[in-house]
Swiss-Prot record:
Keywords noted in UniProt: Endoplasmic reticulum, Iron, Isopeptide bond, Lipid biosynthesis, Lipid metabolism, Membrane, NAD, Oxidoreductase, Steroid biosynthesis, Steroid metabolism, Sterol biosynthesis, Sterol metabolism, Transmembrane, Transmembrane helix, Ubl conjugation
Main location (coarse class): endoplasmic reticulum
Family: Belongs to the sterol desaturase family.
Gene Ontology CC terms: endoplasmic reticulum membrane; plasma membrane
Motif Histidine box-3: chain residues: 257-263
Protein name (database record): C-4 methylsterol oxidase ERG25
Taxonomic classification: Eukaryota, Fungi, Dikarya, Ascomycota, Saccharomycotina
Listed InterPro entries: Fatty_acid_hydroxylase, Sterol_Desaturase_Related
Originating organism: Saccharomyces cerevisiae (strain ATCC 204508 / S288c) (Baker's yeast)
GO molecular function terms listed in the Swiss-Prot or TrEMBL record: C-4 methylsterol oxidase activity; iron ion binding
EC number: 1.14.18.-
S-S bonds: none
Amino acid sequence: MSAVFNNATLSGLVQASTYSQTLQNVAHYQPQLNFMEKYWAAWYSYMNNDVLATGLMFFLLHEFMYFFRCLPWFIIDQIPYFRRWKLQPTKIPSAKEQLYCLKSVLLSHFLVEAIPIWTFHPMCEKLGITVEVPFPSLKTMALEIGLFFVLEDTWHYWAHRLFHYGVFYKYIHKQHHRYAAPFGLSAEYAHPAETLSLGFGTVGMPILYVMYTGKLHLFTLCVWITLRLFQAVDSHSGYDFPWSLNKIMPFWAGAEHHDLHHHYFIGNYASSFRWWDYCLDTESGPEAKASREERMKKRAENNAQKKTN
């Protein structure tokens, strides 16, 4: 029996042989639930197996949201009008490159990412990640997701930076740098070891959070993973528009930040924000290099002046 309702009698009342009938029953017995909560409760009640319900939902969510976000960038790449905002306008991915990348990404999704996704619910039960309705408040979810963005960005910066050293780059991260001019679909084109290690930032940070607080809702995780997927695809899109988020939030990394990383193969290691690269002087690109050289020049002049005095 599903744990979506903390009431065995209610769980029995809403169950039906079809999903649509289950949804009607949920709406009848729980009219106070909002639109999403009713569909959520009906899904878990209809499946009547939380392990299967969570596994299937997470897998389909990941596939749909990833390719749903990749599709607009694929279309934009075919329209010359948008080249004015392309960061590397002479490097448009060919159909052959897109197809090769698609095959590799699908292989990764089904052979690498599917196993942890399908075995995730038992861990949820042990950690206290709940599927019950109603959902947490919007304020609670927003604060938690904001924290996850900050924590994931921190993990990503240090893990990504490690992947640019020696054997880690040669045998693992080099695969992701096959494309010096990234495109949306290439966001998850990576070695399995990189997929799992960098993916820990997305899933592992919420796990650490719930281990500390003892409370987290699975719907919050769904929203977080969706936003993280959108961020990853957008940062690999290769386009920087006047309305891009980094124009509104200067500390947001965006496509321009990550495109420089792929172009120069070094620096700009963070995923969502710019502060780690700024504070640790790992910003990439001509402007960052010029600024770094200017600071070094001034430092040398100051040291020379001190010695003279």
